[in-house]
């Protein structure tokens, strides 16, 4: 039974190939149909906390500093972990769907939620002491107090996210991106309304946006849960197999922990970058400029993340279905989208290099500095888009551990030391720090390219078969 399964795409009878029937063209259309909605979804999800910070900032400079600090701390210690762990579902749910093991998909998603909740309790304990932690690290007591209060009201949002992200991956791996699109955009609009109501109508100050974020995440969780429960599209996959629950949790952590390491190591690097900028000769200027560059970079990255999610889904589905060569074509299709997307946004950014800074500041010094760093930012766009796609391949294939080790070597053994050396020893300041990021991304991209090019896709399909179809928890 296994041989036809593994060689399904090799048994297809060749026919005359035209542009419309070319495998790459066909797969490019499929990936694009997933990538476009998912890019919108990731942007909407990214804007939830951004809108909260923007609204909180209208309460004053002190409040903005406290909220920004809380947002940074909670991202590093909580939200990044939740986002990372769920990468396991891109492997497990995606390959199960491709293998038509529909009853396993719901079990994997529910096991992820059950695994996330205890972790949220542990993170919440840490968040309760944020004020004391920040003061012990030398932060201003008043800013620390605001950050601690803001983080406290974000705790419910963490639990909401623990439900939202697994359900999102549950739908994504089945190709159900239109419901994801509508729920994400609806939640964003709801969040704007709740933010305005709590801050300006009820006068809850800078805690209002945090409360709004928590309410919005739970609103998001409820509408996603309702869709999963009542939609006919999920009829085959929303079931729960109790006998597989424990083994599903084990598999979730096997792939989730290295997946979380992949995400967290990357997120944490940029927080270290901002901290280092505060030690430079002109800390106010350097921190402001690097924060602007990081914001621009993140806005682009969430678009690349949408493409990566689409590629991950197609790769995992095809490996689970025993179509290794189609999985390989999915990678090529993702890289084609990367070329178009990164070229477009890099050219756009470079063209607007002298005016984009006005979105953040009116200071000529800041504007000139941002324009000076724009070529490096364009290079980051290209590299990060490339690595995002290949990291999506890693998650879809189930080799998150390689991605985790790659990020450790690329960013912390190469990129960070190079950046610190250029910034402080060579006195390149913020430009030196960002050069370190570019060097680290280059190493990361090179390693990922070598690993991806050397993949034996037939072997990956065999591993997917053993990982998903086996009645026991045989880990590939």
UniProtKB/Swiss-Prot annotation:
Family indicated by similarity: Belongs to the multi antimicrobial extrusion (MATE) (TC 2.A.66.1) family.
GO terms under cellular component: plasma membrane
Domain of life: Eukaryota
GO biological process, one term: xenobiotic detoxification by transmembrane export across the plasma membrane
UniProt keyword list: Cell membrane, Membrane, Transmembrane, Transmembrane helix, Transport
Tissue: Ubiquitous. Highest expression in flowers and stems.
Species of the source: Arabidopsis thaliana
Encoding gene per record: DTX1
Disulfide bond entries: none
Protein name per Swiss-Prot or TrEMBL: Protein DETOXIFICATION 1
Membrane topology: Multi-pass membrane protein
InterPro entries from the UniProt entry: MATE_euk (IPR045069), MATE_fam (IPR002528)
Known role: Efflux carrier for plant-derived alkaloids, antibiotics, heavy metal and other toxic compounds. Involved in cadmium detoxification. Requires probably a proton-motive force for the efflux.
Localization annotation: Cell membrane
Matching CDD domains: MATE_eukaryotic
Segments crossing the lipid bilayer: 35-55, 66-86, 117-137, 146-166, 184-204, 208-228, 260-280, 289-309, 331-351, 370-390, 402-422, 433-453
NCBIfam families in the cross-refs: matE
GO MF annotation, one: antiporter activity
Cell membrane among keywords: yes
